[in-house]
Every structure is written in structure tokens, then in C-alpha cells.
């Protein structure tokens, strides 16, 4: 008798050839919807086509099919990202002054775009130094390339080609995993396995390989660059990787190889894995040895985290158990049922991810200037301002997106019959208390924060400076913020005994880092002016949250419309005969939330731009005297509304308004054009649908008279469509106006 070990059961996780590849179907607009596929009767058709093309919920109710479409779309997204990156690297290789910038980053500006002379627009090619004429870029790519050890344009070409290959690969993967081997629903819902791969694979091994690259390639190359060695003389990356003696000349402990690691004598590696804090005085960036150490530590943490969850072997945590154990004395059933929500509603899952990623993006914005990670980034003021502004906007949009998808989850995926007394149910049951308290907080913050400014404007207008809230009259010092600053400034040698400097120069301590006569960073003083504007931040953020949270908590029902869930995520009003029920859909809350998000982020980036020009950025003389760009006027000017208008908006707009005839003139045109786009939005936002329908009908009459009427009937935009077009142009116009204003200013004076 032969005893066989039991055959392992192989779980089949994919379906083969589930959907045939049909070019005929792809070529047919609206193939995903019976109604839209019929073709246009009226012009509303094109709007519905765009609104529903990616609303996979509306194509089918089969969760597996929806999951596959989302998964496939992700590969398409990655393909576009690789294509974009490839373009950036190609521009660096083909059209840029990267090699010149590398040899003298303090006197030469980064440029990767040279305008062709067609109608005289070669005026835009400004002199960026070193005899190169082009458009100055503010994306920070040059600084990243230097930090990663790229020393010539051939390397950029190779990376660009590599990214193109990856883009093609991603496109193929998107097709393959929808049409050839599509994962089953069980695969999408296997969260423990997903966590293992994402934590240990993406974040763990990703960080480890980046740390390895930094140690073996970036550090030695940057060491040579910092010492002033000509980039052409520096050995190439593969020489450092293959030849240990080369590295040992720079870092002697390399000669010992892995012995110190296995004998636990890790301090030997302290040459290239440091814990210094502060900035490298040569480049004004974080110490690259600190960054390598950081990525190694992060890699270890995530590799451990990736092994915490129970998959094929019966050990480790189960997500469902963790969530169901999560309850306290006041939280009823706690998170019971949350596991089922997050594995069956991708909107709920996406909502959490957007909220966290949005918050993280805003954290990134604040770290990019306070702990500038790349060499010569801190002294490139245009790039610093651009990176801060960009990450703030992106974070704001992601957080509004979180509320949007939370509301879609509530309308489409929430099942009240199966939820009782878990945390979500308890939040919904006392939503009135939450919203009314939040509303009170908004009113309090609004009146008090704005009231402080109005007081100051009034006192200033009446010529009574001694009665103003300011650092020289009635002081309102931000004592808690100053306490946090001091705690961090004193950390080295106290709470962080191993560090030689604090995490950021902004905390205080008197250090100043200047590179090539320009200030990289110095301690940022906070005073009454910051106290005032921070309360405006609190106000705008709370109002944004009020609108978005109300939209989520009242997405399914309200006293006004008890059956709101039946009307869907977006609807204009609750039908005829019910006046006063317009603008109550969850979609309308997202619409309104976007405007307040725009308010909130605008105040933040204005605060940052002016504060940095006034108190941080500037030049330093040989005697060590710092001259700031706006001479420290923030503390006294920004404490009145009039000061913001006069000394920030008007005074700093002079560069963009006077840019005609110079290399910055494109910003002047954009400033004008984007104002126009913004104003155009008001035509959609302050208009009634009937007005346009009447107008359209008389225009159609004229076309009929001339026998040129189209077969597709023109229709005025629906209320929701009009609002969507309006808010899009409002945000686009506002953001582009700000962009032109900031860049013309900072490129001219920075």
C-alpha cells in the first residue's frame, strides 16, 4: 500500500477569457449602457456619456465585474503615469541644461523647455545662466536626479526608454487581467494577502532597494559632486556597484563587507547610515546619509509589518478579528460589520484611502520646505513654492474626494437592515448633535478670527496703532506653537541624544544654512500675525468639514427628504410640488465643499508664500547680514485685511502685471486668461436653466429658417451639469491664476 501525502488544494483565483476583446464594441460610444449606446437624440447624450463612462456601478451590479473593471483601469492609470514620467525624463535628456546645472547649481537655473521661434514667442526663453536660454522649470526634477546620482543625459534617455517600456507593459497588463485572466472576487477580497504584498513588497522591498541604491550609487556620486569633482570624471553607477574597493576609498567600513552586519557590530556602518539631523551646509538639503538610514529603517518596519497577517499558514492576525475586537465601554458593537463593508464596498474603501492619502499629501507639502530632501532644493525658491502649492491643492482635492465616495457608499452600498449599533450606526443616530456642534464651532471661529482682522482694520483706519493686535501693541502670541518649536529645537542632546541637530531648522536654535549667498532655511519666528491667520485656517477647514460631513451623514435621509436614498447620489430637487428641496443631494454637498476647500487652500498658500518671502527667503552678505525678499513685512502688514490686499496681492502682483515684453510674459497672459476662465464659471453658477433653454429655442428657430438645423436636438445643461461645469472652471481658473501670480513673482525676485 502506497501512502501519499494529501494533495494541496490549489485555489483557482482567475477566470480564463471571461470577456472577449472586441474592437467593434470599443469603437461604439456608450457600449456600456443600453440607453447611451442607441446614440444621441439630444445634446444631453454627450454629457451622460462622460458622466457614466467610468461609473462602473451603473454598468452592472455584479461586484466581481465592477472589481475587474476598476483593477484593469488601475493598470491604465499606471501606464499614463509611466508615459508622463518618460516625457519628463526625455525632456531632461533632450531639451535641458541638466549637465550645466549639475556643474553650478547655485548660479544656473533649471530649464528643460526651449521654445521654438514661430511668431516671436522665443522671447519666453529667458537667460537661466551659463549661456542657456529656456523656460525656467520649478518641478524639482533636477534636484531629484542629482540626489539619485544621475550625472549625464544618457542616463536620462535610458530611464525615459525604460519608462516607455513599462507604460506598454502596464497597458498590456490592464488588457490581460480583464480579457484573458481576470481575478475572481475572492482574490480582491483577500485582504490579509493584499496587506502582505503591499506592506512587505511595495513598501518594504521598495524602500530597501531604494536604500540600497542610495548607499551604493547616490552617496558616493553626491560625495564627489559636493567636493566639486567634474561630473564627467565621476565613476559610473555600475562601477561603484561592482567594485567594492572604489566605495571603500570613500567609506572605509565597506572593505569589511557584510561581516559587521552578521557579527552585530552595526556601528561600523555609521559612516554612511547617519543620524545627524539638520541640513548639509554644502547643498542645503537633508544629509543623504540620513535619508539612506531612514529608508533602511522604514524597510525593516514594513518587512516586519508584511508578516503580521494570517494567510496560507494559520498564524498571524485576521483583519476581521481585529475589527470585531475593537470596541470600548461606550461604543456598542464597535467595528463589528466594518470588515464586510470594506470588502464589499469599494467606495467605502476608496473613501478611507483618499482621506489618508490627502492628509499625507498635505504633510508632504509641509515637510518639503521644512526638511528639504534634495540637494539645492531649498535655495530654488520657485520650486519650493511650487511644490508646497501643488501638494496642498492635491491634498485638498483628495480629501473632498474622500467625502464624495463616502457619500456614494452611503447611498449605493450601505444596508441599514444589517447594521445595528455598530460605530457607523451610532454616528448616524446622533448626526444632528455632530452637525449642530460643528456648525456652532464654525460660527465661533468665523466671527472671532475675522473679527480680529476687522478690529485691526478699524483701528488702523482710525490711526490708533497702539490699540491693534500686533507684536508691538496688544500681543496675541501663539504660545502653544512656540512651545512645540522650542521642544523640538532643544531635542538634540536631550530627548534625541544621538542627533547632532534638530529635525528641522525651522524649530529654532539660531542655526542658519545659506548656499551660494542665498538662505536655504533658518528658524521661523511665529507671532501675532501667524496667530491670526492660523485661526482663519481653522475656520475654513472646519467649514469645509461641516459641508462634506453633512453631505455624508445626511446622504440617505433627512427631515426634509426622508427617502433621499431613493433619489440617488446626485439629483437637482425632490421633484415638482416640493419647493425648497434643491441642492440637497450628496453630490451638491461635494460641489459646495469644493468651493470651501478652494478658500481654505488659498489662504494656506498665500500665508506660506508671504511668510517665506518675508521671514525666510533672501540673500546673506559676507558679514552674515540677511536681507529678506520682502524685508520682514509679514508681522506688521498681514494683521489687517487691507495689508493682505495692499502688501501681498497688489504689491506682489506687480511682476505678473508688468511681465509683458519679458521672458515672463506667458505668465502675464495666463494670469489674464485664467481670470477669464474663472469669470466664465460664474455664468454657469449664477444662471437658471430655463433662461438658456429659451435662448436655445430661438437659436434653433433661426437654424430651421436657414435649413441648417442639426439632427441632434440642442438642450440646455441640466442643473447638475451646469454646476459641474461651473465649479470646474471656477477651480481651474482660480488655480491657474494663482500659479501665474506665484511663479512670475518668485522667478523675478527669487
From Swiss-Prot:
Keywords of the record: 4Fe-4S, Chlorophyll, Chloroplast, Chromophore, Electron transport, Iron, Iron-sulfur, Magnesium, Membrane, Metal-binding, Oxidoreductase, Photosynthesis, Photosystem I, Plastid, Thylakoid, Transmembrane, Transmembrane helix, Transport
Keyword Amino-acid biosynthesis: no
Reaction it catalyzes: reduced [plastocyanin] + hnu + oxidized [2Fe-2S]-[ferredoxin] = oxidized [plastocyanin] + reduced [2Fe-2S]-[ferredoxin]
Subcellular location(s) of the protein: Plastid, Chloroplast thylakoid membrane
GO molecular function (one): electron transfer activity
Cofactor: how bound: P700 is a chlorophyll a/chlorophyll a' dimer, A0 is one or more chlorophyll a, A1 is one or both phylloquinones and FX is a shared 4Fe-4S iron-sulfur center.
First-level EC class: oxidoreductase
Binding-site positions, chlorophyll a: 683, 691
Residues involved in phylloquinone binding: 692
Gene Ontology BP terms: photosynthesis
Bilayer topology term: Multi-pass membrane protein
GO CC terms, sorted: chloroplast thylakoid membrane; photosystem I
Binding site for [4Fe-4S] cluster: 573, 582
Enzyme Commission number(s) of this protein: 1.97.1.12
Entry keyword Thylakoid: yes
Transmembrane annotation, as ranges: 70-93, 156-179, 195-219, 291-309, 346-369, 385-411, 433-455, 531-549, 589-610, 664-686, 724-744
Positions with a binding annotation for chlorophyll a': 675
Role played: PsaA and PsaB bind P700, the primary electron donor of photosystem I (PSI), as well as the electron acceptors A0, A1 and FX. PSI is a plastocyanin-ferredoxin oxidoreductase, converting photonic excitation into a charge separation, which transfers an electron from the donor P700 chlorophyll pair to the spectroscopically characterized acceptors A0, A1, FX, FA and FB in turn. Oxidized P700 is reduced on the lumenal side of the thylakoid membrane by plastocyanin.
Oligomer status and interactors: The PsaA/B heterodimer binds the P700 chlorophyll special pair and subsequent electron acceptors. PSI consists of a core antenna complex that captures photons, and an electron transfer chain that converts photonic excitation into a charge separation. The eukaryotic PSI reaction center is composed of at least 11 subunits.
Family of the protein in this entry: Belongs to the PsaA/PsaB family.
Protein name, as recorded: Photosystem I P700 chlorophyll a apoprotein A1
Species this protein is from: Coffea arabica (Arabian coffee)
